[in-house]
Amino acid sequence: MKIFSILLVALIICSISICTEAFGLIDVKCFASSECWTACKKVTGSGQGKCQNNQCRCY
């Protein structure tokens, strides 16, 4: 049971790491969220993004 708990915690930590690195800020300057849609589509395959602190964030 102790080994199962350790494996479960390791799996959760790895999953969080993978999910947070998958999407995020990309190196594209912007002034409006609509400028990020095409850039995010090219990088992540999804057109979901917004302009945050003059930099595109993709979801």
UniProtKB/Swiss-Prot annotation:
PROSITE patterns: SCORP_SHORT_TOXIN. InterPro entries: Scorpion_toxin-like_sf, Scorpion_toxinS_K_inh. Disulfide bonds join 30-51, 36-56, 40-58. Its main location: secreted. The record marks 50 as: Basic residue of the functional dyad. The record marks 59 as: Aromatic residue of the functional dyad. One of its GO terms (cellular component) is extracellular region. The record marks 38 as: Important for the inhibitory effect on KCNMA1 channels. It is found in: Secreted. Residues 1-22 form the signal peptide. SUPFAM superfamilies: Scorpion toxin-like. The keyword Disulfide bond applies. Alpha-KTx 16.2: inhibits large conductance calcium-activated potassium channels (KCa1.1/Slo-beta4 KCNMA1/KCNMB4). It appears to block channel activity by a simple bimolecular inhibition process. Shows a fast association rate and a slow dissociation rate of binding on rat brain synaptosome. Significantly inhibits voltage-dependent sodium current and voltage-dependent delayed rectifier potassium currents. This is Potassium channel toxin alpha-KTx 16.2.
